[in-house]
Amino acid sequence: MKEKTPFKNEKEFHEMVKKTKKGTFSGWYIIDKDNNSVEFSGKFNRQFKLNKPVITVNTEYVTRKELNEYKDSNDQRLTKIETTLAAQGEQINKLTQTVEKQGEQIRELQVEQKAQGEQIKAQGETLKLILQTLQKMSDRLDKIDPSK
């Protein structure tokens, strides 16, 4: 059996709005005790549903012209990024070549230093031999001329 009950006061109305969390309602609500449900009758300013999600409709539309402009701007941005990446790739290749040339120059310098080191070693040995020869000559001169 259904009984019709008006909103008795503003507090009851606001409690019903809090339960539904959407819109405003003016009118009657009907309590169905058999089904444990509530039905409404009256004026609805917004969509009113209990325990059901309200699906909002997106009212933002994009025209084809705006979509094409967006695609064009994206294409331009991507083209700009591609050219920047290509330029950076060329710079990286040039830097790699420079590093390889410098590596070769360093290897050549190391070979030259090694050769110079061996040459200095040989000169040092020659100087030792000259010193030994001079020492022997000095010893002979001392034997010949003992006047000192």
Curated annotation (Swiss-Prot):
Domain of life according to the entry: Bacteria
Pfam family, one: DUF16
InterPro entries, A to Z: DUF16
Family, per entry: Belongs to the UPF0134 family.
Protein name, as recorded: UPF0134 protein MPN_204
Organism: Mycoplasma pneumoniae (strain ATCC 29342 / M129 / Subtype 1)
